[in-house]
Amino acid sequence: MGAPRVVAKGMGEVARRIRELGAENGVPLLEAPPLARALHRHVELDQEIPGTLYAAVAEALAWVYQLTTWKKSGGQYPVPPQDLPVPAELVPEVVNG
């Protein structure tokens, strides 16, 4: 088994549709713009994530695992991770306008 792979990506309307399909299918949504931007910029579809993003993706996947456990067992809702460790050089600048 290799590293996690990017299975969908997009910007604007495509990203909105991905989120919409996820919601319709019960897929948890984690808001992590720096990680999303780094993955979008540096990883192609069906490509494994680079080692430099392992820690950030591992934290996100750990939260998903906690959600799965919570759904089965109840208890306190898992706190989504904040400030995922995404190397600054991988996060593209956001240009408005």
Model-assigned labels for residue ranges:
Residues 1-97:
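Divalent-cation
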